[in-house]
A protein has these predicted regions:
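Enzymes that bind and transform nitrogen-containing heteroaromatic metabolites
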Residues: 1-216
Length: 216
């Protein structure tokens, strides 16, 4: 049965997954990009963007598997953008250029209606204004039997967690204290009764945690 999954989602030691102050120069907020240094170091990331080099090993293996059996994605409007300092917000088509790295349908949660559009490489963006369950239903239909990836950001992951709709999370704990920002595990009382950590895999840079919905 297809699942809703979170994969390679970075979280700091004090629980933050995004920093305040998002802008064109700082998509993850001020100093938030430090959460992603482990990704930038992998061979998988460098190969994806046509660059040589990158390290192999545990982190690279997790990144290489992060798109396995994914047929569609869901993200929040803050992850899609635009940031507050974008000049032409109506023309905004995401952070990723003309050929985004998704290569499948992406459903963006939004409070404002916006026409769907297609990008190079098979990525399409559809904007959903009637809630998280509607987005999930549309994403599962588009995925055609494959899993749906919940890409982020933190507020969106938190909404789906509170609703108990996520089947599996792969969180990456980065040895970094941020002090402020946005957490996924905030105001999610009762989540401990729904989920459990079943796998802990440390690398030299980060720790990988697999959290699944408890069997009933």
């Amino acid at each position: 049965m297809p699942k809703l999954v979170v994969r390679s989602f970075a979280i700091s030691l004090d629980g933050f997954s995004a920093a305040p102050g998002q802008s064109l120069e700082a998509p993850f907020g001020k100093d938030g990009l430090k959460l992603m240094n482990w990704v930038f170091a992998t061979r998988f990331f460098n190969t994806m963007f046509g660059k040589p080099g990158g390290v192999e090993g545990i982190d690279n293996d997790f990144m290489a598997r992060s798109d396995d059996n994914i047929g569609a994605s869901i993200m929040g409007r803050h992850m899609f953008g635009p940031p507050p300092d974008a000049k032409d917000k109506e023309a905004w088509k995401g952070w990723w250029g003309e050929n985004p790295p998704y290569h499948h349908p992406v459903f963006v949660l939004s409070h404002q209606k916006k026409a769907s559009f297609d990008m190079e490489g098979g990525t399409s963006f559809t904007f959903v204004t009637d809630g998280i369950e509607s987005a999930l239903k549309q994403a599962f239909a588009a995925a055609k039997g494959k899993d749906v990836r919940l890409a982020g950001g933190p507020a969106t992951v938190r909404q789906y967690l509170k609703a108990g709709l996520i089947d599996e999370l792969h969180l990456v704990q980065v040895p970094l204290l941020m002090g402020q920002g946005e957490r996924i595990f905030e105001d999610v009382g009762g989540v401990e009764s729904l989920y459990e950590c079943v796998e802990f895999t440390p690398s030299k840079a980060v720790s990988h945690l697999r959290i699944v919905k408890k069997a009933r």
